[in-house]
Every structure is written in structure tokens, then in C-alpha cells.
């Protein structure tokens, strides 16, 4: 198990490709172990779910609007025709304040469409400090490949 002990091959592939598709064991543990190794190498890390992400690029890097649940209440002339809109800070905004590289681990990445996965790859190319790891399902052992290679298959 030297792969899980050092994580150097994973980090080397992540830095070379920017966006990786990962298949991790379903019992868990591999993702937190690798994130701990990345933090030890100087990365700022964040783990989040891909469910409910919406437009990934806007959600992760730009200030954007959301509509809170109405909970059955009627708005009386306070909001727009579509309802109240609240502005939300980007998910990765605080991680980009330092000069450290940023690693984002997205759980349940199999719910994302092909175009959303390609936009994540493009985002890694435009923002050189950002590295994205997308968990694309389970496997008996930890496997990863570049996202572009995964999408071609």
C-alpha cells in the first residue's frame, strides 16, 4: 500500500492534469487520506457534494443569486416576480485569498453531465491554482485517471 502512504503519484497526476476522475472504495477513507496528504503538501482543500451544484463555474468562483425555499409563505411586494433572490458568496472564495494551491474534492460526481465535467476541466485551465478531483463512483481499489481521458471512454 505505498500508494496510500505517500500520495506522491496522485499529487503528481493531479498537478499535471488539473482535473481527475476518481473511483474510490465505497467504505471510504481513501479521500480523506489523500486530502490530508495534499494539505501536507501545501494545498488548501475543500470537500463538497456535486448534487445541487447548478452551474459549477458560477457556483464555485463567482458571486451568484439563489432563491430560498418559500416554505408556503407568500411574498407581498418584497421580491421580484420569481420570488426573493439572495446573493451568495462563491464556494471557493475564501480559499483563493491565500497564495496556496486549491484542491476541491467533489463527491457524487456521477450526477454531473458531460458538459458540466468539461466545464470543470476548463475552469482548471483558466485558474492555474485550482485542482479538482471528481469522485465518479466506487471501485474495489482506488483508481484515478485524467477527466478528459475518462470522458473519452
Curated annotation (Swiss-Prot):
Q: Does the keyword NADP apply?
A: yes
Keywords, ordered alphabetically:
Membrane, NAD, NADP, Plastoquinone, Quinone, Thylakoid, Translocase, Transport
Give the record's membrane topology. Peripheral membrane protein
Any one GO MF annotation of this record: quinone binding
The organism sits in which domain of life? Answer: Bacteria
Output the InterPro entries linked to this UniProt entry: NAD(P)H-quinone_OxRdtase_su_N
Q: Can the keyword Ligase be found in this entry's annotation?
A: no
Q: Pfam families, per this entry?
A: NdhN
What is the role of the protein in this entry?
A: NDH-1 shuttles electrons from an unknown electron donor, via FMN and iron-sulfur (Fe-S) centers, to quinones in the respiratory and/or the photosynthetic chain. The immediate electron acceptor for the enzyme in this species is believed to be plastoquinone. Couples the redox reaction to proton translocation, and thus conserves the redox energy in a proton gradient. Cyanobacterial NDH-1 also plays a role in inorganic carbon-concentration.
* Family to which this protein belongs: Belongs to the complex I NdhN subunit family.
Share what the entry says about its subunit structure, partners included: NDH-1 can be composed of about 15 different subunits; different subcomplexes with different compositions have been identified which probably have different functions.
Q: What name does UniProt use for this protein?
A: NAD(P)H-quinone oxidoreductase subunit N
Amino acid at each position: 500500500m505505498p500508494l496510500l502512504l505517500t500520495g506522491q503519484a496522485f499529487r503528481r497526476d493531479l498537478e499535471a492534469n488539473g482535473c481527475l476522475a476518481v473511483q474510490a472504495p465505497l467504505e471510504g477513507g481513501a479521500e480523506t487520506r489523500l486530502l490530508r496528504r495534499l494539505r501536507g503538501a501545501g494545498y488548501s482543500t475543500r470537500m463538497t457534494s456535486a448534487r445541487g451544484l447548478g452551474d459549477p463555474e458560477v457556483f464555485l468562483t463567482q458571486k451568484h443569486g439563489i432563491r430560498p425555499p418559500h416554505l408556503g409563505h407568500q411574498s407581498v411586494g418584497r421580491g421580484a416576480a420569481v420570488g426573493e433572490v439572495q446573493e451568495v458568496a462563491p464556494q471557493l472564495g475564501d480559499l483563493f485569498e491565500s497564495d496556496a494551491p486549491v484542491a476541491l474534492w467533489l463527491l457524487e460526481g456521477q450526477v454531473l453531465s458531460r458538459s458540466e465535467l468539461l466545464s470543470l476541466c476548463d475552469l482548471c485551465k483558466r485558474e492555474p491554482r485550482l485542482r479538482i478531483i471528481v469522485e465518479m463512483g466506487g471501485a474495489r481499489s482506488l483508481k484515478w485517471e485524467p477527466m478528459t481521458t475518462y470522458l473519452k471512454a
